[in-house]
């Protein structure tokens, strides 16, 4: 069994500190804790394979634009013959407040372009996802600026908390399975 753990984000440097990059941040946190460098480049993604909690994993940050993330994920899934039960996708979600996460075994992509791309490329919604709350902008209709604009200093700790919880969720899933993670962390 090999797990594919995907964090979604935008590869360009200018987006590195934005709400839309929570998935990348979570992968970086996991990598940091286990001394893994996610720097190999293949299938339009930065990745590394490693052992985490005695499980074989690939940590992946697709380097396509967000709305093409599925292209990279699909190539990894096909090449490593990863079953949908072993796919985890981590991404930002405006319907969840900052500092909170939600773990689900399946479901629609919601309004998230990266997830839409993955669902469409894999042809299934049945894979685990960890959504990191980023909340909503005060003024409706400002969504784009909100997700890729810079984050006010005072909001960073809350968002970091969500990233930290997402990391814990991944570790819990690898150790004890998705149900256990859902019970403990949702």
Residue ranges and their predicted role:
Residues 1-105, 116, 120-130, 137-142, ...:
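Nucleotide and nucleotide-moiety/phosphate-recognizing core
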Residues 111-114:
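Hydrophobic alpha-helical segments within soluble ligand-binding/sensing domains
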Residues 108:
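Short glycine/threonine-rich catalytic loop with a Thr-x-Gly-x-Asp
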């Amino acid at each position: 069994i090999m797990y594919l753990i995907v964090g979604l984000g935008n590869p360009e440097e200018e987006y590195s500190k934005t709400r839309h990059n929570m998935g990348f941040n979570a992968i970086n946190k996991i990598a940091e804790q286990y001394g893994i460098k996610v720097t190999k480049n293949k299938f339009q993604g930065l990745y590394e394979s490693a052992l985490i909690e005695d499980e074989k994993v690939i940590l992946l940050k697709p380097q396509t634009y967000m709305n093409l993330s599925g292209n990279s994920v699909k190539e990894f899934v096909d090449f490593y013959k990863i079953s949908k039960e072993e796919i985890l996708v981590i991404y930002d979600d405006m319907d969840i407040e900052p500092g909170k996460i939600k773990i689900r075994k399946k479901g629609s992509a919601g309004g998230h372009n990266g997830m839409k791309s993955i669902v469409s490329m894999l042809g299934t919604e049945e894979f685990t996802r960890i959504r990191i709350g980023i909340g909503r902008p005060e003024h409706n209709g400002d969504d784009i600026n909100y997700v890729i604009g810079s984050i006010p200093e005072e909001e960073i700790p809350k968002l970091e908390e969500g990233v930290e919880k997402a990391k814990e969720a991944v570790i819990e899933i690898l150790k004890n399975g998705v149900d256990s993670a859902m019970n403990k962390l949702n």
